[in-house]
Amino acid sequence: MYICFACCMIVAAQRPSYGQKYLLMTNVCAFIITVGDALEFFAKTQEAALVATKMAYVGKMHIMLFALLFVTGFTQVGMNKKIAWALELYNTILLAAVMTCENHSLFYASISYKLLPGGRYILELEKGILFYAWAAEMLVGICGYCFIALKGGVLKGSKESKLRGTLIFMAALLPIVLLLIYMAGFFPDFDPTTLATTIMSVCFLVAIKRYGLLDAVQLAQERVLEDTKDGLIIVDDKQDKILYLNPVAMTL
């Protein structure tokens, strides 16, 4: 929770830009998720735990959309506004189902309270059809995010740019592994969402502080080198080694 909050503060302190805006929204969603999960962990009644779960879903329903808007903007792929609004509408419908889940069995087929051996109570939530609809959206969204980050970040640009792209890629890859493990039922009493969002925030923090993820001047300089129509090769004359080739130089 504190790591996600720190990431929100660091992103908010960066120079305003398209990437900064959507990365901030992504990390605000991550912070909401971790706060909701923490409140559920310490809840003493079923009603309090259910309210905390609903709070966490406010972040869960929006984090993927904001992450996609960030990565498409960062890699200059671009995202169709109609697709973004369609995803927002879809997530709003699912969020409405979560907020009223005790009145129907669409998102959760059943809701009960379970006492663990350690004396802590947890919610037992049997997954409904809309839960799987949300999980499918998350998996497709994360795969799309990873593909865009891999193509536009990891495999493109200078060494530092590739390291930055790798961190952006890992910010989604590790959470999807945890989500798949959870969906497979290996740890039914352990919700990996908080761990996944924390890993994501750590990756973004390192990318920002170490590799200038939101440094507008540095990113602009790199894109000038990459987008120029002339071939550019930077060589270390002491070690007789090529340090950088822009895309045009690679085709020569």
Regions found by a protein language model. Give the residues of each.
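Alpha-helical transmembrane segments of multi-pass integral membrane proteins
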Residues: A12-G36, T53-M55, L125-M183
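Sensory-domain cores of signal-transduction modules, predominantly PAS/LOV
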Residues: D230-I233, K241
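Juxtamembrane membrane-water interface segments that cap and precede transmembrane helices
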Residues: Y113-L130
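Interfacial "cap-and-anchor" motif at the non-cytosolic start of specific transmembrane alpha-helices
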Residues: M25, G152, S158-E226, I233-V235
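Alpha-helical transmembrane segments
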Residues: A6-I10, C146-A149, L205-Y211
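Individual alpha-helical transmembrane segments in multi-pass integral membrane proteins
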Residues: M1-C4, R15-L106, L130-V140, D191-M200
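PAS/LOV sensory domain surfaces, especially short acidic/polar patches at coil-to-helix junctions
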Residues: Q239-T251
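Alpha-helical transmembrane segments of multipass membrane proteins
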Residues: C8-M9, V35-A38, F70, I176-L180, ...
